[in-house]
């Protein structure tokens, strides 16, 4: 499993994390409980959705 860099503390309370890949690493962008919204944002920024477990 790849580590997401600079994850905000509040994100631990959300089910989906949106991250953007930069130089081969994932960087935190935001967090949502709504999968559709997380997917929408990921598409907008060229990122990906990771389930926060």
Predicted region positions:
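Glycine-centered tight beta-turn/hairpin loop motif at sheet-sheet or coil-to-beta transitions
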Residues: 23-25
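Local beta-strand/beta-hairpin segments that build beta-sheet-rich folds
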Residues: 27-29, 50
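Short N-terminal "domain-start" leader segments
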Residues: 1-21, 39-40, 44-53
